[in-house]
From Swiss-Prot:
Localization: Cytoplasm
Protein known as: Uroporphyrinogen decarboxylase
InterPro entries cross-referenced by the UniProt entry: UROD/MetE-like_sf (IPR038071), Uroporphyrinogen_deCO2ase_HemE (IPR006361), Uroporphyrinogen_deCOase (IPR000257)
SUPFAM superfamilies: UROD/MetE-like
A Pfam family per the record: URO-D
Metabolic or biological pathway: Porphyrin-containing compound metabolism; protoporphyrin-IX biosynthesis; coproporphyrinogen-III from 5-aminolevulinate: step 4/4
GO-annotated biological processes: protoporphyrinogen IX biosynthetic process
Complexes and interactors: Homodimer.
Similarity comment: Belongs to the uroporphyrinogen decarboxylase family.
GO cellular component, one term: cytosol
Assigned keywords, A-Z: Cytoplasm, Decarboxylase, Lyase, Porphyrin biosynthesis
GO MF terms, alphabetically ordered: uroporphyrinogen decarboxylase activity
Length: 345
């Protein structure tokens, strides 16, 4: 086990004193790193995610290179779907493609339940490898939220408008709610296994839920999110982060959920979130596109986010979405260093 562990992010969430604002980046592990690209010359994505030693190496890289205050497990949100009977393929340049999309309640009934130790042992072995031997910061495990997973399963892949997903909600509530309940059960088991293997925080990615209005979120999603988070927390007292894109209209609904940290994209400032009555620890929220700008521009955009975060008192610095491949590793290192220096208590 690691001694003198950097638990800044956990302290921030608990409301304890910290020496600086903690920082990590969504998608910090993977495609923007030259070491990862070199690895991809020899190994496929499947190889990297299914071999614990390789996956642990990729997960650990940003902590070494950028000095982040947390690591996030290098996996795909589709990981728990294949074992339950979803024929999913990750296609380069497209993303997840589902070859057996959900159309009827019979399709939902065909789905099996997940047994993480049997079905995804490589996930748990990666976590154990990181937490038992190497990592000096908390490890974030994660899952896709039921709506976001369902949208892929119904649409058959990425979508811009989620027409088929919404149509199922409106036209066939029995199938919709059966799918939601099944995905909550899967996610609870998957996340619980990650925590029991050594993950110290969980982030739920509800990437596409911003496609829904408030009324539909309350009816079709919120009860299932409450059950998912409550059941996980009922088993383990683990901090839960929730993040989605373009979902600022749902911010008060999210604040009602039993989460610990609310992730903001770049469209809503920390001050605006406070004015809307958000009481959770806030995470975010630099527009990742700014990372392609000159350093003086990046620095000027960082300051108001960090100032508002320090004024709020409960802030984890992150981007408003994931790191993309064109971002230079040196830029991420400088951002992390600037956050640590600028917010030094």
């Amino acid at each position: 086990m690691v001694h003198n562990k950097n638990n800044t992010i956990l302290k921030m969430i608990k409301g304890e004193e910290t020496s600086h604002t903690p920082v990590w980046f969504m998608r910090q592990a993977g495609r923007s790193q030259p070491e990862y690209r070199k690895l991809k010359e020899k190994y496929s994505l499947f190889d990297i995610t299914h071999q614990p030693e390789l996956c642990a190496y990729v997960t650990h890289l940003p902590v070494d290179n950028y000095h982040t205050d947390a690591a996030i497990l290098y996996k795909d949100i589709m990981t728990p779907l294949k074992p339950i009977g979803v024929d999913v393929e990750i296609k380069s340049g497209i993303g997840p493609v589902i070859h057996n999309p959900i159309k009827t309640i019979q399709d939902v009934e065909k789905l099996s339940q997940i047994d993480p130790e049997r079905d995804v042992p490589y996930v748990l072995d990666t976590i154990k490898l990181l937490t038992e031997e190497k990592l000096n910061v908390p490890l974030i495990g994660f899952t896709g939220a039921p709506f976001t997973l369902a949208s892929y399963m119904i649409e058959g892949g990425p979508s811009k408008n989620y027409n088929f997903t919404k149509a199922m909600m409106y036209r066939d509530e029995a199938t919709w709610f059966a799918l939601m309940n099944h995905l909550v059960d899967v996610s609870v088991k998957y996340v619980t296994a990650q925590v029991e293997a050594g993950a110290e925080l969980i982030q739920i990615f509800d990437s596409w839920v911003g496609a829904l209005n408030v009324e539909d979120y309350r009816r079709y999603i919120k009860p299932h999110m409450i059950r998912l988070i409550s059941e996980v927390k009922g088993k383990h007292d683990v901090p839960v982060i929730l993040f989605g894109v373009g979902a600022s209209h749902l911010i008060n609904e999210w604040n009602d959920l039993p989460i610990d940290v609310l992730g903001l994209d770049w469209r809503t400032s920390i001050n605006q979130a406070q004015q809307l009555g958000v009481t959770k620890t806030l995470q975010g929220n630099l527009d990742p596109s700014i990372l392609l700008a000159p350093w003086n521009v990046i620095e000027e955009r960082l300051k108001p986010i960090l100032d508002q975060g320090m004024e709020n008192g409960k802030h984890i610095f992150n981007l408003g979405h994931g790191v993309f491949p064109e971002v230079q590793p040196e830029t991420l290192r400088k951002v992390s260093e600037f956050v640590h220096t600028y917010t030094q208590r």
